[in-house]
């Protein structure tokens, strides 16, 4: 699944600084720490979720000094990091559902493009963006186009190294293609 991918990439590419946006209970934070990352900054707007994330870091035996948890708005934080000149080796964007149906797709596309554009600007050359959508109203092809456009607007080029979908515990039935709502791209910046 995607957390295992994070740990694998971290081990192989020796990430030092990771930014986990919309971290919820810290699944990607813990995976990055398992992969040997130096420090993870995790952002979510839910205090209770951040408390669980910090507890998960502790339950996995990691030193809390290797993490920073921010109870904040992700968009505002990305803009703030940009104005501060912060750079990260890897960034995870795993937002909540922006488009529950196709009728919300246009608004959601703008939101996905904005967070991806901001993230690309914070990504170090050779860094990796793990970007996800769980919106049924956004197709995998549209999501690819959104991310590509965000990179272009940020002045960043890269390679899609993997396309990700649901884990084995999220099967899709033959007669319900809308069930393919989980999608992700792993993009390595040039």
Regions found by a protein language model. Name each.
Residues 39-44:
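Conserved SAM-binding motif I beta-strand of class I
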Residues 88-118:
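Mobile active-site "lid"/loop adjacent to the S-adenosyl-L-methionine
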Residues 48-92:
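S-adenosyl-L-methionine
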Residues 14-24:
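Conserved class I S-adenosyl-L-methionine
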Residues 114, 128-190:
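C-terminal catalytic and target-recognition region of SAM-dependent MTase-like enzymes
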């Amino acid at each position: 699944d995607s957390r295992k991918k994070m740990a694998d990439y971290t081990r192989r590419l020796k990430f030092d600084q990771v930014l986990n946006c919309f971290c919820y209970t810290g699944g990607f934070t813990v995976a990055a720490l398992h992969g040997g990352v130096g420090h993870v900054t995790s952002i979510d707007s839910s205090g209770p979720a951040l408390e669980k994330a910090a507890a998960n870091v502790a339950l996995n035996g990691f030193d809390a000094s290797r993490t920073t948890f921010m109870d904040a708005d992700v968009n505002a934080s990305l803009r703030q990091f940009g104005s501060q000149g912060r750079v990260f080796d890897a960034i995870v964007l795993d937002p909540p559902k922006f488009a529950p149906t196709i009728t919300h797709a246009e608004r959601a596309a703008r939101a996905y493009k904005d967070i991806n554009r901001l993230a690309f600007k914070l990504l170090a050359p050779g860094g990796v963006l793990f970007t996800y959508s769980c919106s049924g109203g956004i197709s995998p092809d549209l999501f690819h186009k959104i991310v590509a456009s965000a990179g272009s607007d940020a002045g960043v080029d890269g390679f899609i190294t993997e396309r990700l979908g649901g884990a084995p515990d999220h099967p899709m039935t033959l007669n319900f293609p809308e069930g393919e709502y989980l999608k992700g791209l792993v993009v390595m910046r040039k």
